[in-house]
Amino acid sequence: MGFTRNELLEVLNSQELSKEEQEKIIPIMKENYDGYKFNINATNHIYNSNMSLYFLAEYVWSRKIPSKLVDVNIASDYNKIGNMLNLCKGEKKLEILRKTVEGEPIIADIVAKFNPAIEFNENDMISMLYYLGYLTISGENLGMPELTIPNKVMKEIYADFFMQIINKEASFQLDNTISQEILREIAIEGKLDKMVETLKIYLNNLSNRDMIKFDEKYIKLIFYCLAMNMKIYWVKSEMEVNRNYTDILLVPRDRSKGYKAIMVEFKYLKKGDTSKLEDKQKEAREQIIRYSEFDEIKDIEELNKYTIVVAGNEIFVEKIV
């Protein structure tokens, strides 16, 4: 089913990897392949064995971190998540995706048997995602398991599918040219102009889609999902670390290339409530200043700080200098 940490270390030692090499690759493997727990009473997580072995095979052959952290053959199996989620309709599907991508636990009574041909309800779908390793046990609530995404690789898969649904509902497809323009502007100039233009398209196209109960707070999630596809960045968020933290932080993986870092704090107002805009911007500025003093943030070079206030169909951006 998977490797414990000790079993993984045995595999690493069998490949005659030095202590220095192990210290380099274990944190990457932990972030991307660890996190699985299939018993509410279990005390330790396990690593995905298939993905771990793929990573090690690539590393042992090249002595470099693989550029792709998921084998294409394994990734094709993960595309099945879309087919499963499509069995659940409308807002329920989007809400499950929102919770999972944001890191919010899903409390569910895992069923032992289900028959999609007869009936396939929300709890059945959550149970199936659990059995197939798309969700895992992260805690307990009143005797029932709390389920979350186990690791970064799985989060990227969910984020991709979330954007597929959003693109379909918005009748808008972000092409590769626009994606590259957004990335180039962020990385080279530290600006968000093209990203915000794209967010406005989603906001305007989705605001009238009552069938999915679109909320302006989805804009932050769309920003996060788009950022997850920027492979030159580490993406951290309040959703991810589950504590008092900036909403979204983009830090270049390779700081020697001079790419800009980005820090964003989001706030929201009801449509027509722009009289409170300055108050919301001030609140966001104060949070940005406070978070900037965190040890892991204050030493980040080339950090560009922004507040974004979403009010109805409008987006107000302020750069903090």
Roles of regions detected by a PLM:
Residues 8-20, 178, 189, 304-310:
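Noncatalytic linker/hinge segments flanking ATPase motor cores
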Residues 39-40, 251, 293-296:
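Intrinsically disordered, low-complexity boundary segments flanking structured domains
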Residues 27-39, 140-141, 239, 306-308:
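Acidic carboxylate-rich catalytic motifs and surrounding loops in phosphoryl-/glycosyl-chemistry enzymes
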Residues 16, 231, 296-299:
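Secondary-structure transition/hinge residues
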Residues 45-286, 290-292, 302, 319-321:
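Extended alpha-helical interface modules used as scaffolds for assembling large macromolecular complexes
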Residues 296-321:
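Domain-level recognition of nuclease-like catalytic cores that cleave nucleotide substrates
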Residues 14, 290, 294-295:
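A generic secondary-structure signal
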